[in-house]
Amino acid sequence: MAYYLKEPSIPTQEPERTGILVMNLGTPEAPTAKALRPYLRQFLSDRRVIELPRPLWWFILNGVILVLRPRQSAHKYATIWDKEGPPLMVNSQKQARLLEGYLHEAISSPYAVELGMRYGSPSIASALGKLKAKNCNRILLFPLYPQYAASSSASALDEAMRTLIRTRNMPEIRTIRDYHDHPAYIHAVAKSIRLYWQQHGKPEKLVMSFHGVPRRTYDLGDPYYDQCQTSGKLVAQALGLEEDQYMIAFQSRFGTAEWLQPYFAPSIQALGKQKLRRVDVVCPGFSSDCLETLEEIAMEGKSLFLEGGGGEYHYIPALNDNDTWIKAMREIALDNLQGWVTRR
């Protein structure tokens, strides 16, 4: 089998296009232990995610985690799975499709948008293949992670590059590293919160929860923590909040090592013990609702807050297919497509 991939057959009249590859984490095929096992194996075998020595991690992964965790995770996925499928997949597909339509209003040159998932299907490799088949000789890689982390943004870019280095006719490549302080992104998050408050009233405190990563990665130079702090402060400023009206926390800790703090779970429980009448939680680092927002934050977080003695607990949905967010995606993409496309 040849190492370099065969180029797709493209009709001579097919125009050259600019491709946008929208990338997100991915999801299992079904909320079952059988479907979770290969998904978790791929996810937890990623060196960007787990940096332990491979022989040690192989025994932990195959001897413990893949024996116990699939069944546990399947139960959690079942609580958020709907008729259309997993929310992350459904929303990501809508985002890619809507972005393609919204770009038509802004650019006149030929282009195409595809969705690729880092783990599971549709894979990043298959999405790149579709863009190549559409005669895309320039491709913008757009990971839907506002804040850069090696375990998310870099992992998605790694996977794209692994496919591209096997490409015989290499396209021009640009990457969106992050957009943590992009005005359109901050505006979209702040507006979604503001609209929620217009319908449901305001809380005593807003908690902005970001996905956690091991503290060690920060010590080694990963900018994720600083970018989360910047995003949170910019959103708070856009909402006109004082420092005592909001807090930033980190969720989804995995394992026993120290992760970025403050941890979400003990923080939300402590707010409950303070007898706050109402707390709202939003997850600015997630472009789409998923297991971590709908189960961990909306369900588990609520239980912790109420058990602590708190009053009302509100989860503010992720940006999903929000019109303001799709327009923000367009602006972020256009900023990185300069010189490649013709604006209307």
From Swiss-Prot:
- Would the keyword Iron be found if you checked this record's keyword annotation? yes
Q: Name the keywords, alphabetized.
A: Cytoplasm, Heme biosynthesis, Iron, Lyase, Metal-binding, Porphyrin biosynthesis
Q: What is its main location?
A: cytoplasm
- Name the top EC class: lyase
Q: In which pathway does it act?
A: Porphyrin-containing compound metabolism; protoheme biosynthesis; protoheme from protoporphyrin-IX: step 1/1
Reactions catalysed according to its record: heme b + 2 H(+) = protoporphyrin IX + Fe(2+)
EC number(s)?
4.98.1.1
- Tell me if Metal-binding is a UniProt keyword of this record: yes
Location in or out of the cell = Cytoplasm
The UniProt GO MF terms for this protein read: ferrochelatase activity; metal ion binding
Recorded hits in PROSITE patterns, A to Z, give: FERROCHELATASE (PS00534)
Annotated binding of Fe cation, by residue: H211, E292
Q: One GO cellular component from the entry?
A: cytoplasm
A biological process (GO) of this protein is: heme biosynthetic process
Q: Which Pfam families match?
A: Ferrochelatase (PF00762)
Q: Which InterPro entries match?
A: Ferrochelatase, Ferrochelatase_AS, Ferrochelatase_C, Ferrochelatase_N
The text of the family note is: Belongs to the ferrochelatase family.
What's the stated role of this polypeptide? Answer: Catalyzes the ferrous insertion into protoporphyrin IX.
This protein is called Ferrochelatase
